[in-house]
Amino acid sequence: MAASGAVEPGPPGAAVAPSPALAPPPAPDHLFRPISAEDEEQQPTEIESLCMNCYCNGMTRLLLTKIPFFREIIVSSFSCEHCGWNNTEIQSAGRVQDQGVRYTLTVRAPEDMNREVVKTDSATTRIPELDFEIPAFSQKGALTTVEGLITRAISGLEQDQPARRANKDATAERIDEFIVKLKELKQVASPFTLIIDDPSGNSFVENPHAPQKDDSLVITHYNRTQHQKEMLGLQEEAPAEKPEEEDLRNEVLQFNTNCPECNAPAQTNMKLVQIPHFKEVIIMATNCENCGHRTNEVKSGGAVEPLGTRITLHITDPSDMTRDLLKSETCSVEIPELEFELGMAVLGGKFTTLEGLLKDIRELVTKNPFTLGDSSNPCQKERLQEFSQKMDQIIEGNMKAHFIMDDPAGNSYLQNVYAPEDDPEMKVERYKRTFDQNEELGLNDMKTEGYEAGLASQR
């Protein structure tokens, strides 16, 4: 991954040599400009480099660009005028997400083979029914379909088959049998499971039923293990020692980060805030001076509650849009009248108003990259247009609806405008979590009482 403002090393076969004669061009407004043949300002950076073939000086050209609906990349090209050696390579420059992501797709019909898939270099692809796995970093990233992934795997297995058959290798026959099984998957004679596990969080599998829930697709966000962090080249910074007298509640802390829109350096502000009639939370806000993008995120400042919380609000008046709202990362949102459900971890944690969250949901659904452009499905466009119109009616107060927040961790909040009295239009339920919910929160294997005895026995 390329850091903002840095230049990636040259491709294999080239070593950069110092050259005072070449000065870097002035930095553009955006580090990664959308790729376009008509953009005259989008010029590659040229660096004189050492050719590892003839050891004379050649030229490396670097182009920082962005592929629409995909991610940022660095295109590098080396050529040597002395020996004719040349090399071209594409490297990812996308930002590693806060969490890894795992897509589990059950392919039941031929239509599922046409789902759009974004697979990055760090993603692992598995088909459990065939005990088949494509390890991470064994293939370059690709924008393809489910069928394209299988076709690419078949091509890779067939590549060295002629040499194996010529040498009468015993594995050639077994590979042929396995290739036949992969080709049968493309016919979808029976259901099978496709798993794409990406620790970087940058892979994607299309939901053709958006904004409705996809019963065939399960999306799981998870925290990376130490091994996965090392594989991605991420290093945890040692926490800085803070003075004992430091009071974080009355101070706004700042730390450096990269803008999620233009990838330019930006600053994030963080502060502890006490929400009335609720608890303490951490609010983080980022403001990019380069492109003007603004974002905010909320983290819970307390522990997981003993019981989960389900809040149901009957929206009957436009004034309901002004209610303060805290949505944690573990909270899901449901609007039954629209047959809409927003899963956990989507949109992250937010401290906003009800109107602000509904607008964020509308923008998230309507700006899905696979529903835009000439190749999108007209029926899907109509569904999204109808969904957007109904959402506008709810925001404007012209349509009554139920707004449900379900947080197994109990760290979400919706303002009661009648506090401390009960709100006649709002229902707050406390419930006991299921085993699966505790498993997803990592609570089943957590021992908080009597652990001293276990440690003593291990010694």
Curated annotation (Swiss-Prot):
Region (Disordered): 1-32, 439-459
Species, as recorded: Papio anubis
Name of the protein in question: Zinc finger protein ZPR1
Start-end of Low complexity biased regions: 1-20
Subunit structure: Component of an import snRNP complex composed of KPNB1, SNUPN, SMN1 and ZNF259. Interacts (via C-terminal region) with SMN1 (via C-terminal region); the interaction occurs after treatment with serum. Interacts with elongation factor 1-alpha EEF1A1; the interaction occurs in a epidermal growth factor (EGF)-dependent manner. Interacts (via zinc fingers) with EGFR (via C-terminal cytoplasmic kinase domain); the interaction is negatively regulated in response to epidermal growth factor (EGF) stimulation and EGFR kinase activity. May also bind to the PDGFR receptor.
Classification of source organism: Eukaryota, Metazoa, Chordata, Craniata, Vertebrata
Zn finger limits (C4-type): 51-83, 259-291
Functional note: Acts as a signaling molecule that communicates proliferative growth signals from the cytoplasm to the nucleus. Plays a role for the localization and accumulation of the survival motor neuron protein SMN1 in sub-nuclear bodies, including gems and Cajal bodies. Induces neuron differentiation and stimulates axonal growth and formation of growth cone in spinal cord motor neurons. Plays a role in the splicing of cellular pre-mRNAs. May be involved in H(2)O(2)-induced neuronal cell death.
Origin: domain of life: Eukaryota
Coiled coil: none
This protein's UniProt keywords: Cell projection, Cytoplasm, Differentiation, Metal-binding, mRNA processing, mRNA splicing, Nucleus, Repeat, Zinc, Zinc-finger
GO terms of molecular function: protein folding chaperone; translation initiation factor binding; zinc ion binding
Annotated SMART domains: Zpr1
